[in-house]
């Protein structure tokens, strides 16, 4: 039985926890919250550190030096991070759901995730090039498969 099936999120080692991240990059997108409805909207404006092809942070280990507001996702706060997409492995496991069939822990690489359209690859712009963030609202980050 795989570690994510036999352990709770809080029982996982830091290496196991980190490996749960599929690297889709959706959590690195700028998001907006409607002041009146409190509805969350994703944009295609990506963090300046996000590599648009590999969908990985270019400075993950020292990202807070560049982006102090970057959020650390932990077993303790994952339930509060309602802005994480439904496809996020952390959110799925916290809700008692299984990893999706395209997850790199199941497939051995990010290829299936990219082919399934579940990553930011080829869909984003650098946040520094965005003038009116409202013009960049997108729905595709909300997509969830199996």
UniProtKB/Swiss-Prot annotation:
Coiled-coil region(s): none
Identify the Pfam families for this entry. Answer: CxxCxxCC
Query: Cross-referenced InterPro entries, in alphabetical order?
Result: Puta_zinc/iron-chelating_dom, UCP006173
Family affiliation: Belongs to the UPF0260 family.
- For this entry, the protein name equals UPF0260 protein SO_2573
Q: Which organism is it from?
A: Shewanella oneidensis (strain ATCC 700550 / JCM 31522 / CIP 106686 / LMG 19005 / NCIMB 14063 / MR-1)
């Amino acid at each position: 039985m795989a570690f994510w099936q036999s352990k709770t999120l809080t029982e996982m080692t830091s290496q196991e926890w980190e490996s749960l991240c599929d690297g889709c990059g959706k959590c690195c997108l700028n998001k907006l919250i409607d002041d009146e409805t409190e509805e969350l909207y994703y944009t295609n404006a990506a963090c300046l550190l996000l590599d648009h092809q590999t969908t990985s942070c270019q400075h993950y280990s020292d990202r807070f030096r560049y982006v102090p507001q970057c959020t650390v996702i932990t077993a303790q706060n994952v339930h509060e991070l309602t802005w994480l997409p439904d496809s996020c492995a952390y959110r799925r496991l916290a809700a008692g759901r299984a990893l999706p069939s395209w997850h790199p822990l199941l497939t051995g690489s990010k290829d299936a995730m990219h082919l399934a359209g579940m990553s930011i690859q080829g869909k984003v712009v650098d946040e520094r090039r965005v003038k009116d963030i409202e013009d960049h609202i997108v729905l595709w980050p909300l997509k969830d498969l199996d």
